[in-house]
Curated annotation (Swiss-Prot):
Organism: Bat coronavirus HKU3 (BtCoV)
Further remark: Bat coronavirus HKU3 is highly similar to SARS-CoV (SARS-like).
A GO-annotated cellular component: virion component
Assembly: Homotetramer composed of two homodimers linked non covalently. Interacts with M, S and E proteins. Also interacts with the accessory protein 7a.
Topology feature Cytoplasmic, residues: 56-78, 126-274
Entry function: Forms homotetrameric potassium sensitive ion channels (viroporin) and may modulate virus release. Up-regulates expression of fibrinogen subunits FGA, FGB and FGG in host lung epithelial cells. Induces apoptosis in cell culture. Down-regulates the type 1 interferon receptor by inducing serine phosphorylation within the IFN alpha-receptor subunit 1 (IFNAR1) degradation motif and increasing IFNAR1 ubiquitination.
Molecular function terms from GO: monoatomic ion channel activity
Subcellular location: Virion; Host Golgi apparatus membrane; Host cell membrane; Secreted
Protein name as it appears in the record: Protein 3
Amino acid sequence: MDLFMSIFTLGAITRNPAKIENASPASTVHATATIPLQATFPFGWLIVGVALLAVFQSASKVIALHRRWQLALYKGVQLVCNMLLLFVTIYSHLLLLAACMEAQFLYIYALIYILQIVSFCRFIMRCWLCWKCRSKNPLLYDANYFVCWHTNNYDYCIPYNSVTDTVVITSGDGTNQPKLKEDYQIGGYSEDWHSGVKDYVVIYGYFTEVYYQLESTQLSTDTGAENATFFIYSKLVKDVDHVQIHTIDGSSGVVNPAMDPIYDEPTTTTSVPL
C-alpha cells in the first residue's frame, strides 16, 4: 500500500526530512506532519492521462476512411497519440528514477521502449517505401505492397495485398454497373483518374520490386461489371532491362521501362477510356 501511494503521489520530487510538530502524548490528533515525498504533478494524473489518451486513440477509429483527407486525419491523430504516449512514458520513467523506484518497473519500461522502437522503425520503412513509390500512399494505407506506374501527369500508387502472377486494373468510366467512379481500381482500393496506364506496372514492397507487363485488355469479365476496361498484367520472367512491348500501331520492339509510357495522356489513338 505504501508503494502504491508513493507511486500515485509521485511528481516533482522534493525530499525533506520527516518531522512531526506539536505532538504530545495527550493530543496526537492535532499533530502537524511534514511528508518527505512532495508531488507537484502527481503520478496518478499521468495514469489518468494515459487512459484518456487510449480512449481518444480508439475513438479516432470511428473516422470514416473513404477519402484521402480522412485517411490523413486518422493517421495524424494516431501519430500525435503515439508521440504523447512516448512523452508520458519518458516523463514517468524519469519520475520513478528520481524516486529510486525504477527497479520494480524496469521490465515494463523495457517492453514499452522496444515497442516504440519497432513503431519508429516501421515509420522509417514506410517513408522509404514512399520514396520508392514516389507517393504518400504508403503512409496513408497499411498495405505491405503497392502497384505503381508513373506517367508524365501523375504517379500512381495503389495498395495491393501480395505478390501475384497476375495484376488486374479496372478502369471505370462513370457508367459502370455496379457503379464505379472514373478511376483505376484494384480490389477495394482505387486511385483517381489523372492519366493513362503504361505497358508495365511494378509492385513495390519493403524488399520487393516485381515488374508486370500488359498482356491483354478486356471490356468485360465474369465479375458482373459492365462498361469498364480491365487491364491484365502478367509477371515478367525476363530481365527488367529488356521488356518486350507492343506499340499502338501493332509493331513490337525492345525498350527500356524507363521510357515514356505507351498509354499516357489520352489521345484519339489510345485505348484508354476517357
